[in-house]
Amino acid sequence: MEIILKEDVVNLGYKNDIVTVKSGYGRNYLIPTGKAVIASPSAKKMLAEELKQRAHKLEKIKKDAEAMAEQLKDVTLTIATKVSATGTIFGSVSNIQIAEELEKLGHKVDRKIIVVKDAVKEVGSYKAIVKLHKEVSVEIPFEVVAE
């Protein structure tokens, strides 16, 4: 019996896979629990259309991320903070301050996608990575200066 999985099933397959199982397993467990549907020609056609639409949507999201990366690649930030006499920062500069500076420049970026590798605790030049998409990221240089 050929079925289309509606969710991941351990030791069988992943969501939207077309797999062959024994009739009893399909009719008595997978289909009644909603984990699968029978792979009729119409169901296969609907699956193909759904996958095509999803691929188109993911492509659009990736293009939007690439456009945003193109805007951000030439951006250089300057972050002013309170500094002690020795040049160390009170606290640290994090992705929150970087997101705020980007917003001041007109780029709305969620702070959760900004990665700062090391703790920024001194005045100097650093780099942050903005992960816009799983395949698209951009490195933004920023400088921390005394206020």
From Swiss-Prot:
Keyword Acetylation part of the UniProt annotation: no
GO molecular function, one term: rRNA binding
A family per Pfam: Ribosomal_L9_N
Gene3D superfamilies referenced in this protein's UniProt entry, alphabetically: Ribosomal protein L9, C-terminal domain, Ribosomal protein L9, N-terminal domain
Listed InterPro entries: Ribosomal_bL9, Ribosomal_bL9/RNase_H1_N, Ribosomal_bL9_bac/chp, Ribosomal_bL9_C, Ribosomal_bL9_C_sf, Ribosomal_bL9_N, Ribosomal_bL9_N_sf
Keyword set, alphabetical order: Ribonucleoprotein, Ribosomal protein, RNA-binding, rRNA-binding
GO cellular component: ribonucleoprotein complex; ribosome
Transmembrane parts of this sequence: none
GO biological process: translation
Top-rank lineage group of the source organism: Bacteria
Protein family (similarity comment): Belongs to the bacterial ribosomal protein bL9 family.
Described purpose of this protein according to its UniProt entry: Binds to the 23S rRNA.
Protein name: Large ribosomal subunit protein bL9
